[in-house]
Each structure stands twice: as structure tokens, then as C-alpha cells.
Amino acid sequence: MSSPSSAEGRGQGAAPIRVALLGSTGSIGRQAVDVLAAHPEAFTVVALAAGSSAQVLGEQASRLRPAAVALGDEHALAGLDLPIGTERVGGDDALEVLAVRDDVDLVIVATGGLVSLRPVIAALTASNVVATANKETLVAGGHLVMPVARALASDRAAADPRDPYANPLAWLRPIDSEHSAIWQCLVGEGMPGVAALLLTASGGPFLDAPADLAEVTPQQALRHPTWTMGAKITIDSATLANKGLEVIEAHWLYDVEYDAIEVVIHPQSVIHSAVRFVDGSLKAQLGTPDMRLPIQYALTYPDRRPSPATAPDLVGIGSLTFRAPDEARFPALRVAREAGRLGPRASAALIVADEVAVARFLARTLEFTGIPRLLEAAVARFGVGPGEPDVDELLSLDREIRGAYATGAIGG
């Protein structure tokens, strides 16, 4: 890639940032496409990748005219009607191939699962910036990816401590609204001055529902009160598992101990997160619940550009409310904290188990309250082991946990 200082962070008139978008057909991927297409002067889309949505990928390729596309379904990839000159990239390493292309400056990772770890590490190793919405990258692999990001930042700091790229977050950029908010609150601040990170949560659709959640249906759980998201993350929001995963992400992203990461229920979803400093000050980032905002910030850092999202109308909102999370009623948050403290192996077990448990709930083979029970069982069984796992060990653990679910070794 070209040096970030020559391709990014120079405001209007800079050379377009060359982007590879992995996971372009999912919820985050489609919104990323909207952001990229809205700023053709700022971005050139070099590569697109998707898992199975061939039709959507084909439409995106026609719209953005990338140099290369990849699709998990290689038969469908061969049949795609692509613009003249667009290369088809297949194989198990397709995401890695796209992530390290010489004509790529920034890689958006909107794919799910532990399979995203390899392309993230490959991209950073190639000195490409990564903007990630993939939770597994940090929850299970934070011990693998953050040292690479910190090394890149350290090299830049040695030359100029004021360089925006002297910060690991300039290399591994969070797309989550909460982590984007904390990142923005920390700009210009030193970590020794930070007392605590405050992750806000809407509380989901069952915040004030009757106490018994065992009979909750998938349709009810998918009715998020403020955000429009994919099914998996919407269910995770309802159980508060999503917030637990974000606690683990925060630990790795900001190198902050778990005792200094707090969760606050904020039903209006206006404050996306906040930072409390040692002098008693509190800095928060406010915005409408629109994922295009954190996506765009991750792409344009350290600059800001006009966005299709609107700013919050504080007078119209009127008031903001806050409360502590009820971890007895939503135990997934507690289980996630415990997994994070145990280490990467337990965190990996947590996130794989959650993926399978949510799929079972959506298929109506597991009750809503069974989700945290399965998470706790997986962490207890698979969360302890020697040393910190590498990528191969994490992928092996993924297969082992899925096999345990399939054979009934872990029940609901």
C-alpha cells in the first residue's frame, strides 16, 4: 500500500483511499457500500467479497466496478456477470489475497466468524489499515492482532509522536458504534488520564418486559427498539451478550483492565459510549442510531466529511435516562466478563457458542433463556488450556465446540 500519510488524513483533494470490502452483502457491508458510493472522490473500491449472496454481490460490482471480487460459493462466482476487467478470486485464502493486494490501502472487515482472523492479521502485516466490524477479531484474537497494530503505531511514533498513525487505533479501527464513540472520546487524550470506559446499551426489547423470558419468541427478540441490524446481533442485543463481547473488545482495543470497563443501560441510544477521566470529567459521543456514522469515521479518520446521517435533535429528544444492567436477569453479560478474564481461549469458546446458540434460538430449538446457559457451559468446558492459542488452535476450537453442540455433548 501507499503510506497512510500520503493516501489518508489529508482532507479534501487527497488521493482516493483504495478499499477492499470483505463481507459486502451483509448488513454492515451494505451500509459501507452506501458510504463508499456517497464519496467517490474519497474512495476507490478495489475489491469486494461475500459469502453466498451472489446476486447482491453482482449488483454491487456493477455499481462500484472493483478490480476483483470473491465469493464463498465458487460455482456462483463463476457464473457472476461482472464488469469487463473485474477479476474473480476463489479458494480458501481469497479473503487474505484481497486483503494484501498492492493496490489496497484500507480493508473493511464486515465478515463474521473466526475465519476473519487470517485476513485481518495479513492486512496489518502488509501495513494496510483495517476497519473492522468483526467481533471475533478482538474477542478471540485480540492477543494476536493488537501487537501487530501497536508495532505499526510504534514505528510511526518513533518518527513523529504527533502523527495520527502513531496510535494503534489508526491501524485497527473499530466500526462498532460503541467503540467508535470511545475512540472519538480518546482523541487528544492520554491513556494515563483515563479512569474508566463506559459502554452504553439500549437494554434491548425486553428491558422492561415481565420477568419470565423463557417464552420469548424470535420475532419478539428481533424487534430492537432503536437500531436496525442483522438477526444475530439483534438477538445478542436482547440477551446483552453483545455488550459482553464489547467489554472484551474494549479490553484489547484500549489496553484497559476489566474493572475499568463499565456498562450503562441507556434506552434512547443517543450517547453511544463515554470515557470518565481521573479528574472527574466525563466525555461522551452522541449521535443518531445510524451505523453509517461509525463506518464513515473509520474510513475517513482523522478527517470528517458530510454524512447522510442527521445529528440528534436534543430539544426533540427532551431527556436521556440511564440505569445499571440487571446481570441476574441477563446473565450473558456476566458470563462474557468471566470469559474475558479467563483469556482468549474462553473468549473464543464464548463467541463460537453464542453463534450456535443464537442459531438454535432462531430455529426455535432453544428457548431464549437457554442462550446464556449454553454460553456458560461452553466457557466452563473449553475455556481453559495451556498458553495463548494461535489462529490454527482457535479454528480447531471452533470446530470442536460446534461438534460438541452437534452431538449433544453440550445441551440446552
Question: For each of these PLM feature ranges, what is it?
Answer:
Residues 1-412:
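Catalytic, metal-anchored helix/loop core of enzyme active sites in primary metabolism
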